[in-house]
From Swiss-Prot:
It comes from the Eukaryota. The modification Phosphoserine is found at residue 181. This is Transcriptional activator protein Pur-alpha. The modification N-acetylalanine is found at residue 2. The keyword Electron transport does not apply. Residues 9-51 have a biased composition (Gly residues). One of its GO terms (molecular function) is double-stranded telomeric DNA binding. It is found in: Nucleus. Residues 294-313 have a biased composition (Low complexity). The keyword Ribonucleoprotein does not apply.
Amino acid sequence: MADRDSGSEQGGAALGSGGSLGHPGSGSGSGGGGGGGGGGGGSGGGGGAPGGLQHETQELASKRVDIQNKRFYLDVKQNAKGRFLKIAEVGAGGNKSRLTLSMSVAVEFRDYLGDFIEHYAQLGPSQPPDLAQAQDEPRRALKSEFLVRENRKYYMDLKENQRGRFLRIRQTVNRGPGLGSTQGQTIALPAQGLIEFRDALAKLIDDYGVEEEPAELPEGTSLTVDNKRFFFDVGSNKYGVFMRVSEVKPTYRNSITVPYKVWAKFGHTFCKYSEEMKKIQEKQREKRAACEQLHQQQQQQQEETTAATLLLQGEEEGEED
């Protein structure tokens, strides 16, 4: 896609038309005017909030950031599935684009913004507008990153066109096997406002990002067998507590994740096979001992037979003399 249509004034019209925005806490008339259909944007087409009907979603906080001729709204919301962040861009023509992030993804996104801010600060001056406008072909991104979390993908590209430098953020949602990905949602942040946007996001994360205290979990451990090392690490996510068992060799690493609810079954299974192997090994030892005893008996019988034969031969030779 050429850079000239990367901004949301054009891209947002095609990608973000699934309802109007609601920002009860915004301080501008234009923001309040879009507030009438806020719930529809939360659960409708577009990126889609993480589930829930309009009356089930509660807005906890809202911030507005004005950058050039665009308005950006950052809304922290909560429904039965937890807290999430909606980022909406409203262009000069009223075109809207919106992204939906879980709070954990918002934390990672904030950190990526810091990287883009640092990279942008180290760049030289932009190309002259007439030269940039003369180049119709798409230009390579100045810096790119992407995030993949569950069924959502986020693509971040620091780019430049005749209007200047901007951070383009695109979100796609995978609806499941056979359903493919939905049409992406895209916003474009002018580079001059990245710091202000990042600071507003960081404030919301500080105030609303932690919903509960981290779970108290056992410390990890490890053991070494021959040239392998096994690591046992306990963690947790929204699905519950789990143990990650990793097998590490100098040139190889593999791991499995075991949910807490089957630890007892895993332990019982290991103990069962441990006992069975003990019995098998005991039988093998008994069999080897029996074979060794039989071999010794056969060897002893052979020695006795050989001795008796030699004795008989000696007696026969004596009688002949």
